[in-house]
Amino acid sequence: MHSERAPFFLKLAAWGGVVFLHFPILIIAAYAFNTEDAAFSFPPQGLTLRWFSVAAQRSDILDAVTLSLKVAALATLIALVLGTLAAAALWRRDFFGKNAISLLLLLPIALPGIVTGLALLTAFKTINLEPGFFTIVVGHATFCVVVVFNNVIARFRRTSWSLVEASMDLGANGWQTFRYVVLPNLSSALLAGGMLAFALSFDEIIVTTFTAGHERTLPLWLLNQLGRPRDVPVTNVVALLVMLVTTLPILGAWWLTREGDNGQ
């Protein structure tokens, strides 16, 4: 009789892989509470919240956090608008070049970040646009659009066109149909796509390196701190903050898409 249960060694390998991937993250989280000033003294001498207080009083950290939040919020907003419009334009329409357009929409997230960053920097230099806040937002929006587009187009494909036709047959105009029929079906996909886009933007570093100029987002601040051993405890606190800000939206997006799939 065939058993559907996975072999023990396969389970062991899977859990070993999970531990291998997440152990460094747990180390950073643990040492954010370490009482020692040293980088990674083992075993930890105790627990303290001192470094959280120190980080909260550092103006350079607060400025980096504020900039990252602003960039992520604006890039997510742009991605929601452009990604939704692109998905709506490609939904239920067959025309020459449709597949090519879909490929171009997915290209920014498929290409290596260094290629995207270099291409954006070249484009900005060509039009004499100096790197700064605006260029960071544009750079982040290029790959955030992909996340929103994928979520929305997938939901569009699971939405029955007969619902739209029934709404129009009952006398609803285009706006009413969108407001009361289409948008409720897209709401969880939009929210999940927006949360994923925000998480991707908040911790993006490769594209940001090419487009930031003199600006310093939180990931760039962390990169600059690698050469300062005395600040390692504070750096661990900031790294923990980045992990929380990016992990929570990803978990929320997973939960939303799971609920949406179960409801279809």
Swiss-Prot record:
Keyword vocabulary terms for this entry: Cell inner membrane, Cell membrane, Membrane, Transmembrane, Transmembrane helix, Transport
Loss of function: phenotype: Natural transformation rate of the mutant is reduced by 3.3-9.5 folds. Mutation does not affect chemical transformation.
CDD domains: TM_PBP2
Membrane topology: Multi-pass membrane protein
Pfam families: BPD_transp_1
Side of membrane Cytoplasmic, spans: 1-12, 92-100, 150-189, 258-264
Subcellular location(s) per record: Cell inner membrane
Record has Membrane as a keyword: yes
Record's keyword annotation contains Transmembrane helix: yes
Gene Ontology biological process: DNA import into cell involved in transformation; transmembrane transport
Domain ABC transmembrane type-1 span(s) in chain numbering: 65-252
Membrane-traversing stretches: 13-33, 71-91, 101-121, 129-149, 190-210, 237-257
Primary localization: membrane
An annotated GO cellular component: ATP-binding cassette (ABC) transporter complex, substrate-binding subunit-containing
Periplasmic topological domain residue ranges: 34-70, 122-128, 211-236
Function of the molecule: Involved in natural transformation. Probably part of the ABC transporter complex YdcSTUV. Probably responsible for the translocation of the substrate across the membrane. During natural transformation, may serve as the channel for dsDNA uptake.
Record-stated family: Belongs to the binding-protein-dependent transport system permease family. CysTW subfamily.
Name of the molecule in the record: Inner membrane ABC transporter permease protein YdcV
Organism: Escherichia coli (strain K12)
